Each structure stands twice: as C-alpha cells, then as structure tokens.
Amino acid sequence: MHLYNEWLPPPVAEETKKEKESFARVVRCVKELHRPDDPESVYATLKWISVIELFVRAKSELSVEDVSELVEIGLQIFHSSENKLYAQVRWGNVLVRLINKFRKKLSLKVQWRPLYDTLIHAHFSRSPGPEGWRLRQRHFMAVTSLIRSCRRFFPQGAASEIWSEFMSLLENPWHNSSFEGSGFVRLFLPTNPENQDFFSEKWIKNVLELWDSIPNCQFWNSQWTSVLARVIKNCSFIDWESYLPMLFSRFLNMFEVPVANGSGSYPFSVDVPRNTRFLFSNRTTTPSKSIAQSIVYFLKPGSSAHEQLEKLVNLLEQYYHPSNGGRWTYSLERFLLHLVIAFQKRLQREQQDPDSLPATCLGKPERVAFVGVVLKLIDRGQYSKNEHLSETVAAATSMLSYVEPSLVLPFVASRFHLALETTTATHQLKTAMMSVAFAGRSILQSSMSTAKSQDLGGDVDDRMFLDLIGISLSNALLGMDANDPPKTLATMQLIGSIFSNMAVLDDSSDDLSFMTMASFSEWLDEFLCRLIALLQHLEPNSVINEGLSSSATSGTFLVEDGPYYYCMLEILLGRLSGSLYNQALKKISKFVQTNILPGAIAEVGLLCCACVHSTPEEAVAQIVEPMLLAVISSLKEIPVNGYGGKGSAETLVSNKQDKQTLSPALEAAIDYQLKVLSVAITYGGSSLLPYKGLLIEAISSAFNSSSWKVNGAGDHLLRSLLGSLILYYPIDQYKCLSRHPAAPALEEWISTKASSKDEQVAHSRWHVPTQEETQFANELLDLHLQSALDDLLSICQSNIHSDAGDEKTHLKVTLLRIDSTLQGVLSCLPDFRPSPRHDMVEDLQFFIAGASGSCVGSAEIREKTAITIHAACKYLLEKKSDDSILLILIIRIMDALGNYGSLEYDEWSNHRQAWKLESAAIVEPPANFITEFNSKGKRRPRWALIDKAYMHNTWRSSQSSYHLFRTDGNFSPPEPLTFLVDDLLTLCLHNYETVRVLAGKSLIKLLKRWPQLLSKCVLSLTENLRKPDVQEYVVLGSCAILSSHSVLKHLTTDPKSFSSFLLGILSSSHHESMKSQKAIIELFVKYNIHFAGLSRNILRSLESHVEGSTSGDLVSQIGSMSFDSSSLHWRYNLMANRVLLLLVMSSRIDPSFSLKILDETAGHFLKNLKSQLPQTRILAISALNILLKESPHKMQGKDQPSVSSQETENANSSLDLALSQIFREEGFFKETFESLSHIHITDTDSSSRGNHGSSSFQSMADKSITRFYFEFSASWPRTPSWISLLGSDIFYPSFARIFKRLAQECGVPVLLALKSPLEEFCNAKERPKQCVAAEALAGVLHSDVNGLFNEWDSWIMVQLQNVILGQSVESIPEWAACIRYAVTGKGKQGTKIPVMRQQILDCIVAPLPPTATTTVVAKRYAFLSAALIELSPPKMPVTEVKLHIVLLDELICNMSHSSAQIREAIGVILSVLCSNIRLRMSYQQEYPTEEGKTDVDSQLKEENWFKLISAKASEAVKNIQQASISDSLDTSTDVDMGNAQSNGDSLDDVKWMETLFHFIISSFKSGRASYLLDVIAGFLYPVMSLQETSHKDLSILAKAAFELLKWRVFPESHLQKVIGVILSSADDSNWRIRSSTLTYLRTFMYRHTFILTHEDKQKIWKTVEKLLVDSQVEVREHAAAVLAGLMKGGDEDFAADFRDRSYAEANSIQKRRNRRKSSSTQSIAGVHGAVLGLVASVLSVPYDMPSWLPEHVTLLARFAGEPTPIKSTVTKAVAEFRRTHADTWNIQKDSFTEDQLEILADTSSSSSYFA
C-alpha cells in the first residue's frame, strides 16, 4: 500500500481496503458497455474515465490483472473510435496514466502500426474532419504520449520495420518530409530489450550521416540527439569509443554561444515548416537534456569520454560566468541540471541493480572525476544574475554533496565565507545561504555520522563544517530584515532546513556542538527577539480590504511569497525540548498579549498556531485563554445589534441603545484579536473544550455587534472552531520519532517507496474527534445554523422590520452565520440523498474512500437549509435585487450546499500551488555515499510526507462521492438541488457582473456533477438569445454558461440541445449592444475551436425529417440563412455558412448520409466564391478545399488499376453535374476571379507565405471561423523557401488547390471555361489580378486530368511563354510561385512526378530571343530556381539529369554577366544544380539500379564543372590581387593600352568572383552545403583573401560568406584541405590576409577541437606563435588574442608548454635589459612578441588564480617602462586582469607576495584598488 494511504486517518484507511474490489467492478462495467460491433458504444464508456483516473490519483492498491485487462480494452476502444477524436483524447490520456504507473508490472504486446495509422489519418492526411483545432491539438498530444508510453511494449522486429518505414521519408533532405520523418523516428523507435539487436555499428554510421545532411537546424539536431540519447542509455553493449570525438564535436556546436566576438546564433538556420514544429516537440533551443544524458551514459571506467567532457566543460564554462550571460544561458542552465540529474539516476540504477557489470559501473575514481568537472560549471554559475541558474547551481551542489562530500563541501564552505566578506555584491549572501540550506543535511551527516565510511581527507577538519553551520545560523539572525524580503525568506529556509535534520533541539545534548558561539537557549532568545522586531516592522502589502473578500490571511511577503516562514516556525517549535519550548512560549505569549499589529494578522496568527500545534494544552492555556478573555471584555463595551442569535428578539429591541458608533481603533483591535484567535485555534482540538463557554460567548457577541468588520471576524472564528473540532488533521507532525541509525543526533528521513527493512516506519497520528467535540460542534450548528435559518424565514415571511436598513443588516448577519457554519463543517455535514429513479431502493456505489472529518448534523439539515435558502433567494430577488453583498452571500451558501466537497477541492488545489516544499533542501537522494544507506526513492523529512498525506486526504474527501451520480443513471437529482439550480440560473443572468460570475461558476460545477440537468439549462439559455427584447446582461450571462466545457460536450450527443443551440446563436443578430455581439461571437468561436464532431443520434435526427421531427429542417433552415440575399448581417451569414459546412463535414462520416445534400452544399460554396462579402469568400475557399475530392477525371498512372468505364460514370456524376451547371453560366469565372482578386492584399509586411494574406482585414475571431486546422497541416510549399531573390509573394496555395480539384472533379469543361478569363487576367495591370491568374493556372497545370496535353498545346503553353517574355516586374514572385506549384512532386515525399513537369521545364529552359532585356533574363532565372528546388534529386529521371547538365554549361559560361541581379540568380541556381547532382550521385552509390548505369551518370562522375570552377577561381583571385596592387602603384597619368585591357579582364574576374560568392552563400543558406563541402573548402582562400579590396560589393559578399563559413564544421575527410589553406594563408605576404586567417582560426579551432589530430593542432599552434613576432603590429596583437583563446580551449599540454617557454623568453629579455640599461639590439617586434606571449597566458584564465599566474602578471608589469606599442599592451593587459579578478580579489590577493603587489600597484593608475 502506498505510504500516503497507509498514513490516512484510521477511519479512512480502513475504508481504502475496499478499493481493489470497486476497481474490479469498474473494469467489468466498462467491459459490458464496450461492444466492438457498435462504434457508438464508445460514448457510453467515456463517463467511466474520470472514475478510472480517480483510482490512479488516489494511489489505490489495484490488482495488476484488472489493470492489464483495462489497458487491453482501452486500446481496443481507442483503435475502434477512428473518427471520434474526443473519445480518443480521453481514452488515450487515461491509458497513458495507467501504462506509465504500472509499466514495470504489465506484460503487454502493442503493435505500432495502428497507432501510426491513427496519427496519419487525423493529422497528416489531406481530408481531415471538421474538429476544432484545440481538440486536434489535444488529440495530437494524447496520441504521441500514448506512443511514447507504448514504445516499451513494441514486439521484436518493430524497430527494423519502423526504421525501414521512415527511411524513405529521409531520402531527400531538402524536402519537408524529411523533417516529418525525423520526428516519426524519434517518436516511434523503441529501445526496449526485444529490439536492441537492431542497433548495430552500421545503423549508427547511417544515423550520423543522416544527421549531417541538414546543418544548423536545431529542430533536426534535437530529433537525432534524442534518438541517440535513448540508444546510448539503453544499449550498453555498443562501444562508442570511436564515435566520441565526432559526437562531442556535435554537442559543442549545438550550444549557440558567441565564439570570439561572433554572434550567438546561426546566421541562417534552416526553416522548419510551421506545422512540423507545431506537431513534433518544437524545442528550437539546444537539446540540453539529451546531450547531458548521452554524456553521462558514455562514462565508463577506462573510456575517453571523461577527457572529452572535461574539454567540453573547459570551452563552455566561461559562458556560465555572471558577466557573460545571454540567450544561451537558458540552455546551459538546463545542461548543468540534466547532467547532475542523469548522473544521480545512473548511480541509483547501479546501486539497485546488483548484477550490473563492474566493467560498466561508475566506481569511486569516476565519481570523483565527474564531480570535479561539474564543480567548474557550478563555480562559474553560482552568483549568476539569472535566477534559474543560481537556483540550479544550488540544487546541483546539494545533489553532488551526497556523492563526493570531500570535494563539494569545502567548496560550499569557502564560497560562504567569501560571500560573508564581500561588501559590494550583497545578493551573493542570499545565494550562499541557499547553498548552505540545500547542502545542510550532507554537511551534518558527514560531520556527525558514526559510520565514517567516507574519509574527508586529512587536512579537512570535521569541525570546520560544523562551524560553518554555526556561523550560518548566527548570521541568519542578522538576515531577518523587514526591508529585504528575498534575504529574509532565504534565512528562514536555511533555519527550517537545518532544524529539519535535528532530532531534538536542546541545550544539554552534546550533539549540537555546532552552536559554538553560545548555548542554544541564548540563540533561541535572540531569534525570538529578532522575529518579534521583524513582525513589528512589517508593512502590509495593501490596504486591508473591507467586505467579504478579506481573508484572515491577506499577509505580507512572509505569507504570500512561499511557505518558508510557517514551516520554519512549525519545525523549530516542534523540535524544541520541553524546557526550551516553555521558554519560547512565555516570550511569545507576552508578545501576543502586549501588541496589537493589524498589519501582521496572518503572521502573528501562524506563530500562535505553530505553538498550539506543537503542544496544544500548554499553548491554549498560555496564548488562547488570555486572548479570549481580553476580546470578550472588549466586546462587552461595544454597541450591539443583537442579530447574533442569543436571547429572544423582544429583549434585544429593548436593549438597543441609540445608535452609537464604534471607535475605529477599538474596532481594529477586536478584529485583530478575533482573527489571530481564529488562526491560532486551527489545530486546538480537544484542548479547546474547557473554554467552550468562552468561545460560544465570543462568537455570539461578535455576531451581535453592530460593526460589520467585527461580524466578519466572528465568522472567521466560528469557521476555524468548527474545523478544529471535527476535521481530521495530523498532530505531532513536526516531532522527531525515529533517529538516524548512523548519527543519533539527526532525524532519519523516510522514502515513500519503503523497502522491507524500513517497514516499521512510524505511523502519523491524527486528530480524530472525540464524542465531546462532535457534541460541541452540533451545539454550534444548532446555535448558528438552525436558529439562523428560523430567523431568515421569519424575516422573509413576516415583515418584522419597519426600517429597510435594519432589515438589510439583519439579513446580512443571518446569512453570514449560515455561510460561516457551512464553510466550517465542509463535507462533514452529510450530502443530499438522491432520489432513485424507479422506486427501487439501491445502495450507493463506492469508488474511493475519503472523509475530511467525522459526521455532524444530518442530510435533513442540508435539505432544510436548501429549501429555506430557496425561499430567501426568491424574497431577495423581489425586494433587494440590487444588493450585491446579500446576493453574493446567498450564492456562497448555495455553492457550499450543492457542490459537496468542492471546498476541500479548492483548499487542495490552493495548497498544491504553495508547495515549494520540493526544494532540494529537504530531499535526500536515494544513492547516499556519505552514510552508505541507499533507498529505493528520494527520502524526505517525516513532516513533509505527513503534509503530503494530509493533502492527499483532503483531495480524497473532495472526490469520494463526486462521481457517484455521474456514472449511474438510476438516480435523479434530489428536489432541493433542483431548486438551487433554478435559483442559480436566475442569478447568473443578474445585471451585476460579480453576481453573474459567481453564480455562473457555482452553476457550472453543479451541472458537471449532475449532467441530467444540462439539457433543461441549455434550452432555457438558448431561448434567451432568440428572444427579441432581452437585456444585455442576460445575453452575457447566457453566453458565459453556454461556453463552458460541460455544455459544449453535451451538445455532441443531445439532438434537441444541439439544434436549439445553433438556431439560438444564428437567430440572435437583433441584439444591438456591442458587448452582447462580442459575447455571442466568442461563444461561436469557442464552439468551433472545441467542435468534436457529431454523434450518430444527432445525424439520425438531422435526416429524420420524414417523420416530421423539428430538427430535421435544421439543415434547410441554416441553408436559407447562408445566402447573400438574406438580409442578415454579414457575420451571421458567415456563421450560418460555417455551421452548414460543419454539419456536412460531420455527416460525411456516416455512410447512410444522402449525397444530394453534399452536392448542393458544394454548389452553394462554389457560388459563394463570387459573394459580395470577403469573409464568406474566404470560408468558401476553405469549404471547397474540403468538399472537392480527386476524381475519375485524373489520368491513370502506371501503378493505379484502371477503373471500368461504367463505374466512372456513376461514381461522381451527381457532383459533376451540380457543379458544371454553375460554372457554365456566362462569365462565372470572370466574376469569381474579380472577387478573389480583392482578397489579395499587397502589403509587404504581412504577406508571409501560406498565411491567407488576408491578415490585415481579419480579426482573430473571423480567422477562427473561416479557417480550418488542416490548412496548415497540408501546407505548401513542401520544400524550404530560402531564395531571397524571389521576393515575397501573395500566392495562396489553397486557391490554386480549388482550381486543381475543380479540374479533377469536372474534367476538360473547366479548362475551357477558364480559358478566356485566364487570358484576360494574365495580362492585367494590377498585381492581385495576375496573382489570381497565377493561382488558377498553377492549379490546372498540377491537376493531371485527361485532356490537359491538348489544352497545353492549344493555349496554355502560349500563355506561359507570354508570362516569361512579359516586361512587368512586380508580379514575378507570384508567377515563380505558380511554376513552383505546377512542378511540385506529388505524394508525401514529393517523388511522384506531375504529368506536365517536363513540358513546363522545357518551356522555361528554352533559350530567350537575343533581344531579351535583362528583366526578362532575370525573370527566367527566377523561374528556373523556383522550379529546380522542387525536383527530388535521389530519383530524378534521366531527362531531368540531362537538363541539369545543359543548364550547368550555360550558367558557367555566364558567370561574369554584367547585371548584379543576374549574377546572384546564377549563383543561387548553381548551388541548387550542383547539390542536386551530388545528392543523386550519392544516392545511386548506395542503391545502384540497372538503368542507372547510363552515359549520363558517367558524365556526372567526371565533375567537369568542379574542375572548371576551381581552376578559374585561383586564377581570378591572383588577377584581382595583382590588379589592386597595380592600382595602388599606378598613379601615373599615361595608361598604356595593355593596362586598360587587363583592367577590363580584372573587372570580369571581379564579377565572376561575386557569382562564386553568391554560390557559396546560397549553399550555406539553403543547408545544401553538406553535399558541396569539398568544393567550398577549395574556395576558402578566395573568401579569406578578398575581404578588403577596392571593390566594395565584392568585399561585402566575401565578408558575408566568411561569417557563414565560421559556423561550418568540416568532417574529418575535408579537414586536411582546410588546414592546408589556413597554414599557407598565414604565410601570405599581405598582412590583412594573415589577420583574417587568424580571425578564422579562432572559431575554426573552437568548432573542431574534438576532431583535430594532435599533429594538426601542433602545426596550428606553431603557426600562430610565429605570428606573435610578425612585422605588422595588428597581426601580433591579434595572434596573442587567438592564443589566449586556444589556451582556454582545453589542450593543457600545449598550453603549459607555451606558457613555460614564453615566460622563460620574457624573463631572459628582462634580465638582459636590467644588465645593460641601454636599448638592446633586439628588435621591437621580438620584445613585443615575448610580452604578448605573457599577455596571452594571463588573459587565458580570466577568473581563476592558478599557481603560475602571480609570477606571469608581475613579470608582465615589469615591462611597463618599454617604448610605445609595448607599453600600451602591458597597461591594457594589467587593467583587464584587474577587471576580471575584482570580484574575488580579497581572497586571490593572498597568492601574491608583498613585492609582487607593489610592482602591480606601480603599473596601475588607481592604486587604491589593490589594498
């Protein structure tokens, strides 16, 4: 049994034993309801889902057989409800919960294919149902989590099936299907033991190649990282050693951080289509979790993974430093957190699995090494300005301190002392305190544990840590400051977490030796003094608000910002020994009696409450009794009304003095005392019984008072008193019951997953009410509920008050008393008894146990109250309907009466929010290496677990009877309840908004619990929308209730409500006010978003108009509203159209539905295309896209079986006829084009592709009505759009798709009808008109219908040629999109070739007439680039390959074209052509085919284009450089002819180079560079050398290409080539080239540090060192900066070697200088180089102080007297050193000797800095 259930109050715990049987009963019920032959039976099973979830959340003990039976049934139901998304969402989610909870006990076999089919059918198909997008989103989430849960149950062989299924999607990396493919692989691929044999070396190589095919795309990265992380974790048999350098290189480059002053994010990340990002987990950030998990599971004894991790940390640690924060901080913070969590989980797994192999387990050396590395990150991030990072660091410290205390604890201690000493950065103290709080337990355990299994190392003294705790506690006293909330809370957290560890707090015990500075009682005194001072200085957050809403606890930051204050008091007072507790109690009691602090009611109340909770008898005597007496004596002196219910009415009237007012001070004092009392007695229980008389008197006097504020305080007291008497709550919660076996001074903490030896965990003790307490509670009920009810009736029936004001006051007080009692007894007052339907006396069902206290009163009392309140409500609505306080009170009473258990539910959900208890301070991880006790789960202090058990009980009590009547139709709601529902229905249409909202909330809760009442409510509310003269507030109230989920759900199954709802909304256009219109539209939009299809019985009722039912005419009624001609407002016309569409779409699923309606509707929407209303036109487009299907007119492909002729005729003739009649009308298409062109808005900013462009005139609501979810799941284009020269278009694929479907539906007649309007619009002047023409033409060309060839020859081809040769420029983007659409491949992977593609390509490729202008040339190239992107390279037919070859030749000849625009186009097309060819070649190598061996392929293999370009490039670079040199020399005036000639040549070369740079840039931008890396590596030199030339445009392009190059990681195969280029350019004669080589080197080394060989690194180091003594000063300084970066980068042996050499060199120069005093023979460059070597070493450790640093800095400072470039270098370097070490200088300066500090001070200008 789960610990929380074991610890429930005894009466409840007894009941839980019946839960196993009741779960078995539920499973039987579900089984009976589900009939596999009837798919509609799903709806009947839905009501049981919340009951099944109850058992899971109640942590009940269930039998595994029942669970596995339920899971099997659930999966059947899930698969059988194909089109019922809502049912799939509900069942999917509950299955996920069950499978996850019982995953280790179930033995299932789940097939993956049906799950995949569900996913494809609902989310990736082109013809989805009508469901709203919110539902679709939930459905996607549900299905994907179900797949994730079922992965572990996939049978053997599933992995290879899944891989081969999705491999085909991954063939072409430049098609969006590859993104989908990677998402599916990540989602489905199982790594369970049955499938592990699938993961072989070959598979890994394959994955790494695929991963490399799309660079710079975080979506892609995260999919593959996640797949690999799972394989690495679960398949421990794979040897990863050889892949480590490559993988770590990937990991490093996935963190987008700024390297060497570069930017911190990819310049062009590959664009992932919106729907793919939306559907698959779209973490666009770095996949930190998967990276961390992979790294942790790489670690093994003897593996090189640890060195690699160290290198990774060395490179990343600088970005954790507070001064280097940025966008990347989040992903780095996650990385640190997941590293530590994964490490902890792995240790736990190895601890619990005794047979794991020692060869793969982490031993002591591996643990020490790992902790050492992670501490570097912790050290950097500890004082980060980023809140999350500093908290993560503290949590990580805490977890690691249990693994390696000898490393972590000294670090915590030194950091704490550092924070104490700092004077400038005070925020550090808060963080340091948090660290000590989080590591408190491990510090105490390692110091006090008797089992000294861990030796903390010789020089570390145990006392040191105990002192640390002592110091932190004494400092904590200073930290309590009313003006510094964060620090105060951190202090309280610290005290609470340290004392949670102690068994008892007492002076006499020696164990608390850490209280070095004083005895514990002195500390306690000081603490209470500070606390009292803090309370006296608190400022309340807001003015304490009057009226009902002021709770007793609207507190200051101590209460509002977290539970630390209260927890600390409870723990402290609970752990004190007897004598110390009395000492504290005296002090607190004195404080409470002498102070009145209205600003700190809650805080003082909680202080008293904690005292009472700890030892009730004494605390009640010392705190509660004096306060009670004081408040009663004050109450006697104040004026009374006498409505408090003591004594009879006559005596009171005579008693009443003339109205005298109460002084505000006295009122505030009484209010304060009563409220503090009410909080203090919360846990009083039976110790309050002796003061029974006083309490009754205090409450009655408070209600009798004439002050409303005092009445309210009395209400608090009564509530609290009732709760204290009859509720179950834990007592002794904070006492220590079991001591730690290894360290008796500490408390032993408990894990909820108890292993056998912990069985004797002490139970928690509960307050179970005694007979006297229940009796007292019943007396209070008589006094304040029964008598108040009688008063209420008498006020309402016999007018006893002549004065309206008196009557109001009397009503207020009476209602307040009733409310107060009901809120106090919660669900202890029995619920209404429902009336059985068929005179049968039936036992109520039992689901789960739960009660919040013992029973008081009886169900009769509840019924009597309900009937009285019904009468009172009637009276109030007649007489006092404008008095909101009375109405709100009465609604609260109704809520408490009707919604049994909801008060507990509210309390539970509020408390759940307040749980910051999960903080690391009170969690001890399962694997504890300090005491060597390992448990199955995390351990926590007993009080925290009792708290959870208490909340668990509260939740159970709110749920125990909630679902009893929802599942059982045999009970009808009791009569008093129907009264309440009627009253609430009236109140939720009230004209005060507050009243409406409250009543609405309460009503919705009631309807949810009693679904039988729904239809009555829906009918009466929709009636309000239809009535002509209804007030605005009635409409608002009705809409609020109708838009609730319960109602929307109810509409899917109840025909009557459904038709009434729709007609109600559609016939509500007569409401004038803006607010009501807005409410109605919002309701309609919400209905659309959550629309869940219709159940069979509604569809039946729609058709059954034959039998004369009313809703049958629904379709025709709505149809008549949806025509333009009807005089409706345009938005209602739109809504009617939408409803019509929803009905038709829902009914398509039903096979018996008549096709006639479908045809009529399709015709109706086709006509609507030329409607006058723009919104209706947009909806018509959506509708036609859904209703028109591919049809018989499509040409038969080779692989499709031909359909026999007569079938073709019948199949679709009706729709064909219906549509043909419409579009054959004269001028139909012309008008349609006209009206569609108005929707195209040419504004540049909002016309992003695929977005209907109409964003500028569509509000959000209109969008929700006119669009469908699927419009972006079938989005076009299906390939990434990255070509900027195409411009932004306003081409809407959904328009093109209508024309395509029309052509497929009706064949050639459509083409003929389109001919003349197309000819007219293609030549139109306006861009929108040309755009419509482009869409229509694209659709027709892509339709593949019979007869298309003839039309192409007769007129379409001419039309296209005219477009190409046309002079107009502005519509190029649209026509390019048209061509792109027309040649787009068909099918999911875009590999099926459309029939017209070849013709269209030939038409574009055809050479232009010689007279063509550059505009036309540019246009042709734009069209070409658009068309070529769409080809699918792996499977190109030979014709397309030939086309590629022809084009390549043409383009290479044209690379020096005179127009810049055309050069760019040529560069872009070249990158597409070359990468297409390369991809095809690599595909042919892997999957060679027989017909593949044609002459074309051998032509491709020669790669002539590559040779040509490479040869030309090196020649061009030389020419350009020479030309620029001769330009600079050539100042003479007489230019000879040869020179001019060469100038022209060099200009051609410049143009040629520009084209080449465009080629490089577009290869990177498009992500196609992966296939062209060898080509690009060859062009590295031109890019580096042409950054500074006299040709501005060329240099700009070179710089752009250079920026992109910096991000590229080259694979090992091309590295040698790149390094060769780098080394040779570092020797270049031009110093600018040397400098740009250095710039490239910095990022190059960072990106490739894992994959470079030792020799290569050596060469590079040598080269850079040589540049330290370069003749050009800029190069020297640059080289020093690069070296500093290289030294940070983790190659310690190189760095150390260089440091020693440079130090020796500089030292010898310095000595020679000192000897000669005269200027030496050595050149300036030599000395400068030596100094720069020192500078590089000093700057390579910006924040640390390694042992060699002081000498280096001092030596550097000695050079300050040198001449100019050297002097400034030294000064800058020393200043930089000083800046970066300023934070920790206080400690670091101890590393220097006096002399060294003096030399430093001489160099520094402001010596005060260095004390």
From Swiss-Prot:
Region of interest (Bromodomain-like (BRDL)), ranges: 1626-1711
SUPFAM superfamilies, per database record: ARM repeat
Molecular function as annotated in GO: lysine-acetylated histone binding; peptidase activator activity; proteasome binding
Matching InterPro entries: ARM-like (IPR011989), ARM-type_fold (IPR016024), Blm10_mid (IPR032430), PSME4 (IPR035309), PSME4_C (IPR021843)
Keywords associated with the record: DNA damage, DNA repair, Proteasome, Repeat
Keyword Magnesium: no
HEAT repeats: 563-599, 1156-1193, 1442-1479, 1613-1650, 1655-1692, 1746-1783
Deletion consequences: No visible phenotype.
Induction of expression: Upon MG132 treatment.
Entry's Gene Ontology cellular component terms: proteasome complex
GO BP, sorted A to Z: DNA repair
Domain of life: Eukaryota
Function summary: Associated component of the proteasome that specifically recognizes acetylated histones and promotes ATP- and ubiquitin-independent degradation of core histones during DNA damage response. Recognizes and binds acetylated histones via its bromodomain-like (BRDL) region and activates the proteasome by opening the gated channel for substrate entry. Binds to the core proteasome via its C-terminus, which occupies the same binding sites as the proteasomal ATPases, opening the closed structure of the proteasome via an active gating mechanism.
Family recorded in the similarity comment: Belongs to the BLM10 family.
Domain remark in the UniProt entry: The bromodomain-like (BRDL) region specifically recognizes and binds acetylated histones.
Subunit structure comment from the entry: Interacts with the 26S proteasomes.
Protein name listed in UniProt: Proteasome activator subunit 4
Organism, scientific name: Arabidopsis thaliana
